Amino acid sequence: MSEMLLFEALREGLQEEMDRDPKVLVMGEDVGHYGGSYKVTKGFAEKYGDLRLLDTPIAENSFTGMAIGAAMTGLRPVVEGMNMGFLLLAFNQIANNAGMLHYTSGANFTIPIVIRGPGGVGRQLGAEHSQRLESYFQSVPGLQLVACSTPINAKGLIKSSIRSENPVILFEHVLLYNLKETIPDNEYLVCLEKAEIVRPGTDITILTYSRMRHHVLQATKSLVYKGYDPEIIDIVSLKPVDLGTISTSIKKTHKVLIVEECMRTGGIGASLRATIMEHLFDFLDAPIMCLSSQDVPTPYSGPLEELTVIQPAQIVQAVEQLCNNGNN
């Protein structure tokens, strides 16, 4: 067992897969000799060489397309976006090629590509560097979306993503890279389709992912002190969602709170709420509540930025409201 920061866990997982499979390669801006914008690939260029660590121009559409072509030939490329917001420039390649080529080629091609990088609301990074792209990509057929939230699941998810035959987008939150946790020494994988029960409980099901997992855990300290017993589930797989784990929890608690950093309109929470209403309506004792970021560009101002994102106090208030209303 050894303590690692989240970015170090990603590095170790990626390195293990590159050692295991010579078909795995990495491409992106500054991933080579600079070691990546957050040092996930530090030291890789010296170990694996320039053919497996490809420094690219600032041309996201081009190098993402190049990676998709490499995947079609049997390689397993890992594309790092210096910031996830810049992957909007590669949306055509990701949507029309990565997501759909397996189908449109009559299953003649598989696209085992991983697209990963930092995103989410940081600390005064401005609107363009504070994007949450999960809502953009969730409607693209053929893509699998996962979000890491701890060093342990970050390492396991990147390994499983690389081994998948499907195109996977791995969302990493910029404020979680320095999160520290003890990592098992033995090799392990994290299932791409399985949610994690972070805390069992009986009063309410709280569904969350990425950075908001930690906001929920912070709020839970106050909730437990006040006598509430929330069940916390990190959904991990944003698409497809693990409806089995979610169903079991809701049939026990009968109340649901969704907490996300994604935008309210068209976000992961909106899709999740629709799925729950379709499949589990009869088990609900109260309306589903969804706490999401405001539908505004993220301000540069620190105090204004904080107001756009859900805070622990709002989670406490929402749980109190749902539990009290549901018990009336």
Curated annotation (Swiss-Prot):
Spell out the Pfam families in the cross-references: Transket_pyr, Transketolase_C
| Subcellular locations according to the entry | Plastid, Chloroplast
Taxonomic path? Eukaryota, Viridiplantae, Streptophyta, Zygnematophyceae, Zygnematophycidae
Task: Indicate yes or no for the key word Metal-binding.
Answer: yes
Write the Enzyme Commission number(s) for this entry: 1.2.4.1
PANTHER family, alphabetized: PYRUVATE DEHYDROGENASE E1 COMPONENT BETA SUBUNIT, PYRUVATE DEHYDROGENASE E1 COMPONENT SUBUNIT BETA
Q: What keywords tag this UniProt record?
A: Chloroplast, Metal-binding, Oxidoreductase, Plastid, Potassium, Pyruvate, Thiamine pyrophosphate
Kindly state the subunit structure of this protein: Heterodimer of an alpha and a beta chain.
Q: Which NCBIfam families match?
A: PRK09212.1
Q: Which organism is it from?
A: Staurastrum punctulatum
Judged by the first EC level, this protein's enzyme class is oxidoreductase
* Protein name, UniProt field: Pyruvate dehydrogenase E1 component subunit beta
